[in-house]
Every structure is written in structure tokens, then in C-alpha cells.
Swiss-Prot record:
<dbReference type="GO" id="GO:0005576">
    <property type="term" value="C:extracellular region"/>
</dbReference>
<keyword id="KW-0878">Amphibian defense peptide</keyword>
<keyword id="KW-0964">Secreted</keyword>
<protein>
    <recommendedName>
        <fullName>Brevinin-2Tc</fullName>
    </recommendedName>
</protein>
<keyword id="KW-0929">Antimicrobial</keyword>
<comment type="similarity">
    <text>Belongs to the frog skin active peptide (FSAP) family. Brevinin subfamily.</text>
</comment>
<dbReference type="GO" id="GO:0042742">
    <property type="term" value="P:defense response to bacterium"/>
</dbReference>
<comment type="function">
    <text>Antibacterial activity against representative Gram-negative and Gram-positive bacteria.</text>
</comment>
<keyword id="KW-0044">Antibiotic</keyword>
<feature type="disulfide bond">
    <location>
        <begin position="23"/>
        <end position="29"/>
    </location>
</feature>
<keyword id="KW-1015">Disulfide bond</keyword>
């Protein structure tokens, strides 16, 4: 349903931001 799609998108979005933060703090991916 729509809710699952929204939750999925939110999870991907959050993981993406966390990944970028980790790259900045860690100095590379």
C-alpha cells in the first residue's frame, strides 16, 4: 500500500543521509 511505500522511501532517505554524514565525518566512503 501507500504507507509501505512511504515507509520504504523514508528508510532509504534516512540511510542515504546517514551514509553521507559518515562519509563526511570519516573522510571518504
Amino acid at each position: 500500500g501507500l504507507w509501505e511505500t512511504i515507509k520504504n522511501f523514508g528508510k532509504k532517505f534516512t540511510l542515504n543521509i546517514l551514509h553521507k554524514l559518515k562519509c563526511k565525518i570519516g573522510g571518504g566512503c
